[in-house]
Amino acid sequence: MLVPTVVEQTSRGERAYDIYSRLLKDRIIMLSGEVNDQMANSVIAQLLFLDAQDSEKDIYLYINSPGGVITSGLAMLDTMNFIKSDVQTIAIGMAASMASVLLAGGTKGKRFALPNSTILIHQPSGGAQGQQTEIEIAAEEILKTRRKMNQILADATGQTIEQIKKDTERDHYMSAQEAKDYGLIDDILVNKNTQK
């Protein structure tokens, strides 16, 4: 993927940044693509850096992701909760699966979606092979993970565990308005002036 470069004029001349570094100067982190360990490490490093730089200012996490590895997502979620800075989450395009949990895990009152965003919640998926006991262990682990994810979503949305369990039984797609009504986000951003 070609990463655009931004050129800025400074007192010492011109300075070129890749677009993501330039956005980071404005406390903006882009979470796009599949959630995996590499993405998580990058996002976590940026969260920690911005929090150390100024923990009184908000961090803006823009999310456009189909989801991915749960442990990678939970590492980011734990870091979002660990740092002092408020983390505004903004869905752009798609926030699905683990990405929807990260969207809902932003600072309450500061979780947003753009009007044409799609949000998807569902139960964790996985597979196992090997001996029967190994398959049983893997099955128990995915059930434990599902309970954990349901609790995280219930805490973030105000929905009951029973409702979350029912709604995540199959893919549950939501528009920005439906996600707001459900409690996954707090507001819909039509333009930057409506952002808090």
Swiss-Prot record:
<keyword id="KW-0720">Serine protease</keyword>
<feature type="active site">
    <location>
        <position position="122"/>
    </location>
</feature>
<keyword id="KW-0645">Protease</keyword>
<keyword id="KW-0378">Hydrolase</keyword>
<comment type="function">
    <text>Cleaves peptides in various proteins in a process that requires ATP hydrolysis. Has a chymotrypsin-like activity. Plays a major role in the degradation of misfolded proteins.</text>
</comment>
<comment type="similarity">
    <text>Belongs to the peptidase S14 family.</text>
</comment>
<dbReference type="GO" id="GO:0009368">
    <property type="term" value="C:endopeptidase Clp complex"/>
</dbReference>
<dbReference type="InterPro" id="IPR029045">
    <property type="entry name" value="ClpP/crotonase-like_dom_sf"/>
</dbReference>
<comment type="subunit">
    <text>Fourteen ClpP subunits assemble into 2 heptameric rings which stack back to back to give a disk-like structure with a central cavity, resembling the structure of eukaryotic proteasomes.</text>
</comment>
<dbReference type="InterPro" id="IPR001907">
    <property type="entry name" value="ClpP"/>
</dbReference>
<keyword id="KW-0963">Cytoplasm</keyword>
<dbReference type="GO" id="GO:0004176">
    <property type="term" value="F:ATP-dependent peptidase activity"/>
</dbReference>
<dbReference type="InterPro" id="IPR033135">
    <property type="entry name" value="ClpP_His_AS"/>
</dbReference>
<dbReference type="GO" id="GO:0006515">
    <property type="term" value="P:protein quality control for misfolded or incompletely synthesized proteins"/>
</dbReference>
<dbReference type="GO" id="GO:0005737">
    <property type="term" value="C:cytoplasm"/>
</dbReference>
<feature type="active site" description="Nucleophile">
    <location>
        <position position="97"/>
    </location>
</feature>
<dbReference type="GO" id="GO:0051117">
    <property type="term" value="F:ATPase binding"/>
</dbReference>
<dbReference type="GO" id="GO:0004252">
    <property type="term" value="F:serine-type endopeptidase activity"/>
</dbReference>
<dbReference type="InterPro" id="IPR018215">
    <property type="entry name" value="ClpP_Ser_AS"/>
</dbReference>
<dbReference type="InterPro" id="IPR023562">
    <property type="entry name" value="ClpP/TepA"/>
</dbReference>
<protein>
    <recommendedName>
        <fullName>ATP-dependent Clp protease proteolytic subunit</fullName>
        <ecNumber>3.4.21.92</ecNumber>
    </recommendedName>
</protein>
<dbReference type="Pfam" id="PF00574">
    <property type="entry name" value="CLP_protease"/>
</dbReference>
